[in-house]
Amino acid sequence: MSLATSTTPSALTRPLLPATAARPATHWIDHIWFAPLVLTVLCGSLFFYGLNIGQLYRTETLRAILGAEFLRNGDWIVPRLYGEPLFTKPPGMYAAIALASWPFGRVTEATARLPSAVAATITVLLFYWYFRRQTGKVGGLIAAVILPLNIMWLDKAPSAEIDMLQVAWVAAAIIFLLRALEADEEGHGGGIWWMAAVLCVAGGVLTKWTAPAFFYGTAIPLLWCRGRLRLLWGRQHLCSAAVGASICIGWAVLAVSRTGWEVFYNTVSREALMRLSPAHHDRPYPWVETLAHPLILFAANLPWSVCLFWALRPSFARLWDERGRRLLQALHCWIWPNLLFWSSIPEHATRHSFPLCAGMTGMAAMVWIAWLDGRLKWPVRWIRPISVLVGMAMFWVGLKLVFLHGVVPSRNDTREPREKAAQIAAAVPESATLYLFRLKDEGIMFYYGRPVRRLHGIEHLPSSGEPLYCILEKTEWEGYDQSRPAEAVLWLRDEQGSEIVLARFTDLQPHDDGS
């Protein structure tokens, strides 16, 4: 399918539909309040309602405990877990959680999930703005409404996870890139849009590292298709890239100055190589996962991924004017090059490819716009497409309510992190620091809510005239030689069901902890 198009300003400013084209709208859609009202209700019900329902689940607690550490120690540069630097992810999401929690003085379920809700809302509004600009008010509303109606968004928006914030950064960067190209083609420069796009890429780097892969995985094929690759070497892009890179490098320099080069480099390089390089992965190259990854992504983006089959037809591009074809071309460049890249690397977690879902949904929106305005034949005779779309939106709001009230509260029923944390808090003096060694249970530690520090062994416990409290795994406790008097205060099970023990150490001899 050829999507080559001319770039004359007159072609870009023609309306999407002729005046006589059929419209699925009634007069109330044209009211200035209608779209804001619909999007407010949609975002409020899908993203903000129920922020505080259910305890934090799995790695949500890791993000929250790191955000709480930002608030506690005032260091918003280096993520620290139990006092140790943790560079597996940059500080963006943790800083966002800390910022949302700062007015309340502590991190809660609601404040930990609030950044994802805000990011999801911004993404929906960006889709409405850009699709309205390209396809009209109805088209913008369709794109914004269907964007969050899929399985991935059901789980990730809202949550305390990083992924929704990364989707917002990537989607904003790509949309601003498209505006930069439009401005350049219309002779208006576009420098401010280049700067906005690259700053969003920098925000994505400081959230989850991967934003440049999505951005340039879209920009390079798109510029190549349009014969404008030279823009990557132009002053506007290079100056913007220099600013974005300076922000990221500046953070890295500050982080290294506080922790040392070895800690930073070893963690970041290990994370990158393990996910990108088959030679550094902990298993043989996963051919089956590589082949299955596109299918899994299509399943995660149901029901909208079904619409891609209509969009892939060569005749579909001919249904659109210049603006529509260029938007369709951009969405193709968003989806397929990135899908190829993220399917070929050895790490195939669906959440890493989450920004692709926005591109898929955008293309599905174009199919729905064509169905609704009559340019594409609706395949079902006995029901109108607008009725199906409204019904799906209402169904999804209902599904979200079921998920919030039926699934989320019960996810931690067997783990009981809050209850176990309360038992520990009752046994440990409020002024005491809790120590741990090999234990990895951020759920219990988050709800414990007091200072926790990790040491490399019992022998590194600091000297103190007061009892010291430590949590040990069962094997650690059973292998302890009682060289220092210790007693088990509390036995319980961690979130994975393994036995752990809260121990109290007394009569410690003065010991240099090497700090």
Language-model features: where?
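Short low-complexity stretches enriched in small and charged residues
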Residues: W33, N52-G54, A98, V388-A393, ...
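Long hydrophobic alpha-helices with heptad-repeat/coiled-coil character
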Residues: V205, P212, R375, R381-L389, ...
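Signature aromatic-anchored transmembrane alpha helix within multi-pass, membrane-resident enzymes
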Residues: I369-V402
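Alpha-helix N-cap/loop-to-helix boundary motif
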Residues: L328, L356, M360, S387-G391, ...
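Short, solvent-exposed mixed-charge patches
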Residues: H511-S515
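Short periplasmic/luminal acceptor-recognition loop of GT-C membrane glycosyltransferases, typified by
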Residues: G44, F395-S498, R504-L508
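Membrane-integral, polyisoprenol-dependent glycosyltransferases
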Residues: S2-L376, G406-V407, Q496-S498
